[in-house]
Amino acid sequence: MQLNSNGWHVDDHIVVAVSTGIDSMCLLYQLLNDYKDSYRKLTCLHVNHGVRSASIEEARFLEAYCERHHIDLHIKKLDLSHSLDRNNSIQNEARIKRYEWFDEMMNVLEADVLLTAHHLDDQLETIMYRIFNGKSTRNKLGFDELSKRKGYQIYRPLLAVSKKEIKQFQERYHIPYFEDESNKDNKYIRNDIRNRIIPAIDENNQLKVSHLLKLKQWHDEQYDILQYSAKQFIQEFVKFDEQSKYLEVSRQAFNNLPNSLKMVVLDCLLSKYYELFNISAKTYEEWFKQFSSKKAQFSINLTDKWIIQIAYGKLIIMAKNNGDTYFRVQTIKKPGNYFFNKYRLEIHSNLPKCLFPLTVRTRQSGDTFKLNGRDGYKKVNRLFIDCKVPQWVRDQMPIVLDKQQRIIAVGDLYQQQTIKKWIIISKNGDE
C-alpha cells in the first residue's frame, strides 16, 4: 500500500491521528515501516469520544502499541454529554472538538504536519454527502490532500487508496485494529451513504461512483474562481473601519453580482470581520430580494450585536447600538468646542451673545428652518431626504437652536447665512 508522502519532509515532526480503526492503524503501520525514514519525529494523537464502551479498551490497546514501538502518544477524552442531552449531532460536535484539540496539540508539540487516514472511499462519500445535503455550492466538494490550519498543515496520504486496498493490506500484514460498531448504524447519514447508497450504485454496471472525482475537480476549479472574484470585488468596492467594525459597499455594485458570488462575498465578509458562519442559502436569497427592491432604506438584524442597514445606494454592516446611545439634548452657554454624538461643534466667539444659550438636540417631528437667500421655510425631514441621509444618521445629527428656539444649524447640511462663519459642525474625525 503506497502512501503519498509529498506532504511532509524528512526533517518534519509529523503527527498522526489514530482512532484504532483499520484505516489509521494501517497508516501508522506504514509510517513505522516502509516510510520510517521519511520524517524526523512521529507522534500519535488519539481521541476517546467517551460514547462507546469499547473506547477505554481501544485507548489501552493504543497505549501498549505505541509503547512497544517507542512512539509518543497523547490521548484526549471528550465530553459530549451536552450534545447527547440535547439530541444534537454527535458526529459534528465530536469533529469540532476533535479538531480544536488537534489545533492545541500541534501548537504545544511544535509539529509541522498532521496526518489523517481519510481514503478514496471517504472522499466519494463526502462528495455525495455535500451534494445531497445542499452544502456543495459554498464549499469544496470533498477533501483536499493538503489543508492549511493555524500554524500547521493537514495532509491525507491515503486519499488515492481505496478501502478495498486497505483491507487487503491489513490482511497481508495482520495489522491489529478495532472495528467501530457505530459505523454500521445507518441512522447516521454518512453511514447510510457508505453502507447502502454507494453499494447500490456500484451494482449498476452503467454507473460509476468514481466519476464523482471528475465532478469534484471541475467544481473545485469553479469554487476557486468564485473565491478569487469575491476577493477582487471586496478589494474594489468594500470599505471597512477596523475600530468600529463599520462596513460599507455600493448597493448597486453588489446587486449586479450573480447570487452565487454574492453568497461568497458575504461569507468572506461575515466570517472574517464578524465571526458569523453558516448563514443558510435560503436566508441569503431572502436578503438579496430585499437588497434589489426599490425600497430606499431598511434594516436587517444579523445578530443581537450586528445589523445590516440599507441606505439609498449603500449596503452597510454596523453595530446595532450605533443609533441607540447618543445625546438627545445639550445646552451651550458660551463659545468653545463641543461634541455631540459623532459630531464636533465649533462655536466661535463672534457669534452674537443674544443667541445664547444654544440648544443642541436631535430631530423632532415638524422641525423647520428658514431658507437662506429667499423667503419661506423647509422641513428638516425634507432636507434629510434630499441629501439622502440614512435613518440612523438622522437620529444622531445635531440640530442647533438659538435662545428663541429657532433652528440655525442642521448638522453639516445647513447653517443660517448670518451665522455661517461662527458655527462650524463637522463629523468627529473629519479634517
Curated annotation (Swiss-Prot):
Its EC number is 6.3.4.19. It is an enzyme of class 6 (ligase). The keyword tRNA processing applies. Coiled coil: none annotated. CDD domains: TilS_N. InterPro entries: Lysidine-tRNA-synth_C, Rossmann-like_a/b/a_fold, TilS/TtcA_N, tRNA_Ile_lys_synt, tRNA_Ile_lys_synt_N. It is found in: Cytoplasm. Ligates lysine onto the cytidine present at position 34 of the AUA codon-specific tRNA(Ile) that contains the anticodon CAU, in an ATP-dependent manner. Cytidine is converted to lysidine, thus changing the amino acid specificity of the tRNA from methionine to isoleucine. This is tRNA(Ile)-lysidine synthase. The lineage of its organism: Bacteria, Bacillati, Bacillota, Bacilli, Bacillales.
